[in-house]
Amino acid sequence: MRLTQAPPSRRTLMTLGAGATMAALLPAGGAAYASTSTAKAPAAEGISGRLRALEKQYAARLGVFALDTGTGAGRSYRAGERFPMCSVFKALAAAAVLRDVDARREFLTKRIHYTEKFVKDAGYIPVTGKPENIAGGMTGAELCAAAVSESDNGAGNLLLRELDGPTGITRFCRSLGDTTTRLDRWEPALNSAEPDRVTDTTSPGAIGRTFGRLIVGSALRAGDRKRLTGWLVANTTNRPTFRAGLPDDWVLADKTGGGEQYGVANDVGVVQPPGRAPLVLSVLSTKFDPKGPTDNPLVAKAAALVAGELT
């Protein structure tokens, strides 16, 4: 399974000007994307009301950004507000490694060795914690796959180590025109999701555009874009979020993120209905109670609502 990239629609080209590309549909600005047609304003207001109802139902704060890359139509809700990022960063780490660390095409095949303590300190380690991997190490490609497809915290930290720490993610995002997304700490500390925390956060609009640039834009070389997309399509953690909310025949290239504090539940990526251009979709959520439960159905329902509006 793979994503196919359709050219921008004629209407979008006219709106953006001659020479517009898929990357042009994903502007760097932090403002929430607005629908390109005033005729769709009532629909946009309707979707906002339904998203507010979901917030009330789940006692949560919800942020959504969606963009149809074929038509330029979009929907957003709290798209400029900051939310904890959690494990969503792992896709950015893999992308940064592909672009910057593997520039000479050596890292993916290089065997990376690490100590048992290094990965155990990270928490969730379904792949890096295996005895055979601790003993023999893992290749760069295996670490990327473990971080993105399995959300392995140890693999995420090992990729951060290659990027000279969490601030490497921030620098990478700035190089893409994303002035909002930032990472400051390692796993598992980065998952503390206190209200008003700025560190280790992003916004639905910023992270959505960044994923769009990476997956259907030109931020990565074609081969690297294909590798990253493959790891995202192989995601094993999205069954209760995007996979639960979107039709079974849609291709999903997404990364989840969640935490035990403040009930964080996130999913971000590019999704493709059959026969249509891809949709950029980000859904971020958090609770007001530090012991609030993680409600993946909230993410699934929000994704279904906005995707339904655009298709």
Curated annotation (Swiss-Prot):
Pfam family, one: Beta-lactamase2
Active site residues according to the UniProt entry: 87
GO terms classed as biological process: beta-lactam antibiotic catabolic process; response to antibiotic
The reaction(s) this protein catalyses: a beta-lactam + H2O = a substituted beta-amino acid
SUPFAM superfamilies: beta-lactamase/transpeptidase-like (SSF56601)
UniProt KW Coiled coil keyword: no
Keywords tagged on the record: Antibiotic resistance, Hydrolase, Signal
Enzyme Commission code(s) on record: 3.5.2.6
Statement: the UniProt record of this protein carries the keyword Aminoacyl-tRNA synthetase: no
Protein residues bound to substrate: 255-257
Mod. after translation: Predicted to be exported by the Tat system. The position of the signal peptide cleavage has not been experimentally proven.
Signal peptide feature range: 1-34
GO molecular function: beta-lactamase activity
Other facts: The class A beta-lactamase family has a specific amino-acid numbering system, sometimes called Ambler or ABL numbering and often misspelt as Amber. A multiple sequence alignment was used to derive a consensus sequence and then the consensus was numbered taking into account insertions and deletions. This allows use of identical numbers, e.g. for active site residues, despite differences in protein length. UniProt always uses natural numbering of residues, hence there appear to be differences in numbering between this entry and some papers.
Entry's family note: Belongs to the class-A beta-lactamase family.
Name recorded for this polypeptide: Beta-lactamase
Organism: Kitasatospora aureofaciens
Encoding gene, per UniProt annotation: bla
